[in-house]
A protein has these predicted regions:
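N-terminal secretory signal peptides that target proteins for export/translocation
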Residues: 1-6
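N-terminal export leaders
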Residues: 8-12
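A periodicity- and composition-biased signal for non-globular, repetitive helical segments
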Residues: 13-15, 64
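Cleavable N-terminal signal peptides
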Residues: 15-16, 26
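Bacterial Sec-dependent signal peptides at the C-terminal "C-region" and cleavage site
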Residues: 22-30
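Compact, glycine-rich, soluble single-domain proteins
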Residues: 29-157
Length: 157
């Protein structure tokens, strides 16, 4: 085997390893799914939410999803209360983005956020978490700022 062939074979092996490594990252482990409830003036509704509690999972969010069932969602846990802003880059479906204070009270709701938009959507206050649900669902439920979200990450939740 010539030096050229050996280098070429080594390069191809390295390229294959890199490709397989990146392919593995695209299929990261599924997020933990937990129950969450929203409490409005008209009642309580339960959701099964994926919990995004790492930087990587929060960055990925619901990007590239083609659908979201009415009883599903994603809860972004920031662990530390903070101002937050979201965008819809690479998000294919409209979402209701619900910003939630540390005590579980809803601070603000961005209704039917526009898919693929890179315009920042600010929280309008300090939040511990953000809930994303199917666009239009918050209106169906009669969900408003001041209503409550019950989940283990919120005080009293």
């Amino acid at each position: 085997m010539s030096v050229f062939q050996a280098k070429r074979r080594g390069f191809l092996a390295l390229l294959t390893f890199a490709w397989l490594s990146l392919a593995g990252l695209a299929h990261a482990a599924p997020l933990r799914v937990e129950k969450l409830e929203v409490v409005t003036a008209t009642g309580t509704t339960a959701f099964q939410v994926e919990v995004a509690d790492t930087e990587a999972s929060r960055e990925q969010g619901l990007m590239f999803r083609k659908r979201l069932a009415p009883d599903k969602g994603m809860l972004f846990d920031f662990k530390v209360p903070q101002q937050a802003a979201f965008w819809m880059k690479n998000t294919l479906i409209p979402l209701d983005i619900i910003f939630i204070a540390p005590n579980g009270r809803i601070v603000s709701i961005a209704r039917n956020a526009v898919p693929m938009s890179e315009v920042p959507i600010p929280s309008g206050g300090v939040v511990r978490g953000v809930l994303e649900i199917a666009g239009g669902r918050a209106a169906q439920l009669g969900l408003y700022p001041g209503d409550r979200v019950k989940h283990r990450i919120f005080k009293g939740g």
